[in-house]
């Protein structure tokens, strides 16, 4: 059961709704949620996800991992291209945990320069995934 303050936050303070996950998570609730901000990480993110995937399979069945691929609206083209490659590869990879990908990098979804960065990417992910977390009363 979501407590009153958390419910108020979810209803009023969530990040802009233009950032949506690539799919709706298959189940609810999850015991564990891992949020990963991803900026120009093609060479690293897959090692991180493989490391998570090597954990206890019973735990992974109840784990939701959210990767928010992000950049600012005035980002260098090479970073945007790196983020696009990362997104495409993530869509095709399979893991023992559920993976959600959030596009905060493409046209019309890139972050405004004044709010861009790891903190905003993490907020987007947490805001979207918090309602899938198992909360103890």
Give names to the regions the model predicted.
Residues 1-68:
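N-proximal low-complexity "stem/linker" segments adjacent to membrane-targeting elements
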Residues 6-20, 76-137:
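Active-site-proximal specificity loops/subdomain of glycosyltransferases
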Residues 39-44, 72-75, 108:
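Short acidic, S/G/P-rich loop/turn micro-motifs used as interaction or catalytic elements
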Residues 61-73, 100-107:
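Short beta-strand/loop segment that forms part of the nucleotide-sugar
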């Amino acid at each position: 059961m979501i407590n009153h303050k958390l419910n108020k936050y979810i209803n009023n303070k969530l990040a802009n709704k233009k950032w949506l996950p690539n799919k709706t998570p298959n189940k609810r609730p999850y015991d564990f949620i891992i949020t990963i901000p991803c900026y120009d990480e093609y060479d690293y993110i897959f090692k991180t996800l493989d490391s998570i995937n090597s954990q206890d399979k019973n735990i992974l069945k109840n784990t939701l991992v959210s990767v928010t691929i992000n950049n600012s609206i005035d980002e260098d083209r090479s970073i945007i291209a790196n983020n696009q490659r990362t997104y495409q590869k993530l869509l095709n990879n399979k893991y023992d945990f559920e993976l959600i990908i959030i596009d905060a990098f493409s046209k019309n979804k890139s972050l405004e320069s004044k709010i861009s960065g790891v903190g905003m990417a993490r907020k987007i992910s947490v805001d979207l995934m918090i309602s899938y977390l198992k909360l103890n009363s």
